[in-house]
Amino acid sequence: YCSVLTGLRRKSILMRMEKIEATAAARLTTMPTRDDLRLAVETRGPIDAPAVLFAHGFGQSRHAWARAAEGLAAHGWHAVTFDARGHGDSGRLADGRYALEQFVDDLLTVARSLAAPPVLVGASMGGLLGLVAAGETRPDPFRALVLVDITPRWESEGVERMLDFMRAHPHGFASLDDAADAVAAYLPQRRRRKDRYELAQLLHRGEDGRLRWHWDPALLDTVAREGERHQQRLLKAARNIDVPVLLVSGGRSDIVSDATVAEFLQAVPHARHVEIPHATHTLAGDDNAAFAVAIEPFLTTLDPDAVPASHAHAAVQRGLP
């Protein structure tokens, strides 16, 4: 009897695991922009469930959010990730003249393709695009907003350090190990072996056989040209946001500081703030588990129509608020 029961339990566990894997499996498609580029869009989870839309940071791609998207899809969310223009598998501008408005419009295009306004989770650049879209667009394009280590103002030295890293290898890398060495020097807190697959998603092999970052180098000119001049606009947009907001910051971030967080919370008094003490600017990648713990209570406080029943039930079972 015991052996039969053990076998049934094992079969039940395997069936649940297969169901979770099938639910979290990614579906890749493309979506046209207003100016006829194609955006690479990846979805996970039931398409009729409440949606979470992930927007990646500058120089990243949709793969930066893969683990977080898989986790939410397994809990019943419709998780959507996409490559911003000029990044990953999305289209690039022939003239290389990227502008903030284009990125915001692309974000709104993806959001409006969904059945209802999604929760937006935006890291760095993705969070800034979310701020502009949420603060300058009515009706509200998002059900709620999660900003990941970004505020309307930022510490310039941290941004310059990031840009220096991105400019440092114009001729690419001979191997994945060489690229890993470069990232390890810039992000020593990362566990190198664990990140090799994710690192490979950020690179592409050119005709000369060398590996280069999977984004348009012309984007660096855009940041240098437009960067800080948008900060007042971003702060004004933040003051206009009336949906629930969560700011998740890294305690070791060199881009977000106590001062920039305080200014943001004064501008958006209803916003909540969670700090992950050991994390840097790349906090979701530094510790995805800690990031998930930080955002889950916020997601469960949204109204019932915005939270999958399976996610809310799981949260209650674990004693989350």
Whereabouts are the PLM-identified features?
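Conserved hydrolase catalytic core segment
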Residues: 116-156
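Catalytic histidine-centered segment of alpha/beta-hydrolase-like enzymes
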Residues: 279-292
